[in-house]
């Protein structure tokens, strides 16, 4: 994930993508930009080209981007194929690890896929052990994944502390990782009944994300923010909220197709984003 790994000023995502000299890294970085900008079709088209790449870092990145973009596009079988690709990378690397960095990237990708799908991670190597081998931007995002997992286990103070600690160690601005960290901070504060603080953080994250059009973090965490987007964004930016809402519906349906395959017609699948947010309160 070369773009996620990069430090850049908000608003400079495309320039950062263009700065990569290696063609593979540049194309995967472009796919990242498309994904985080909620342009799933364009992301998928690029990622598909690298699913069997010999470079394990490009292959892992492609697997993640291909899987999650296909969730939004309503292609669960394609999403599952991407996840299997990531698992195969880990199994191959465990048998003959080329480096600590490669192993760390495999563990990171698999842990990320499982946590964001709200699936158990007990059969994976512990991500914490491999964080030192990840580049700074990925390490920050890796801590977001750990914090998200803590949140799912209702460890809200732990999740909040993990996220806040990252901002103390960052040596630059890593917008993608920071926006996801902000999302867990918001979620944790809301569950601690600190809504005013949560809304302040939401506006900080939103203003950072808007500079590059990065709507995806808010799409993925919409329901877990328990109505904060409706409270803060809908009244002031109705057109962006409408765009966000449409993407939330698509992503949520795709997510449920993977997470809950036996409940294809679940109640939440039939709710609008605002109805779902109210139901979560």
Predicted regions and their residues:
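Solenoid-like repeat scaffolds
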Residues: 13-23, 48-59, 84-101, 125-140, ...
């Amino acid at each position: 994930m070369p773009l996620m790994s990069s430090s850049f000023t908000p608003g400079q995502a495309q320039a950062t993508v263009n700065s990569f000299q290696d063609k593979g890294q540049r194309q995967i970085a472009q796919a990242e930009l498309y994904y985080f900008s909620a342009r799933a079709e364009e992301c998928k088209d690029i990622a598909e080209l690298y699913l069997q790449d010999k470079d394990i870092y490009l292959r892992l990145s492609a697997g993640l981007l291909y899987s999650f973009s296909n969730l939004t596009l309503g292609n669960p079988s394609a999403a599952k194929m991407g996840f299997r690709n990531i698992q195969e990378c880990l199994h191959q690397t465990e048998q003959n690890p080329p480096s600590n960095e490669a192993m760390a990237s495999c563990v990171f990708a698999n842990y990320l896929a499982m946590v964001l799908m709200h699936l158990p991670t007990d059969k994976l190597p512990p991500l914490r052990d491999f964080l030192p081998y990840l580049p700074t931007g990925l390490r920050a995002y890796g801590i977001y994944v750990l914090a998200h997992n803590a949140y799912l286990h209702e460890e809200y103070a732990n999740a909040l502390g993990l996220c806040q600690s990252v901002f103390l160690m960052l040596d630059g601005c890593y917008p993608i990782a920071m926006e996801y960290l902000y999302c867990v901070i918001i979620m944790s504060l809301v569950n601690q009944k600190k809504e005013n603080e949560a809304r302040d953080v939401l506006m900080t994250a939103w203003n950072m994300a808007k500079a590059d059009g990065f709507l995806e973090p808010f799409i993925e965490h919409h329901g877990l923010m328990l109505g904060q987007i409706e409270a803060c964004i809908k009244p002031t930016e109705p057109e962006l909220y409408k765009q966000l809402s449409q993407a939330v519906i698509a992503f949520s349906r795709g997510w449920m197709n993977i997470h809950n395959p036996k409940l294809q017609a679940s109640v939440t699948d039939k709710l609008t984003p605002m109805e779902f947010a109210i139901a979560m309160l």
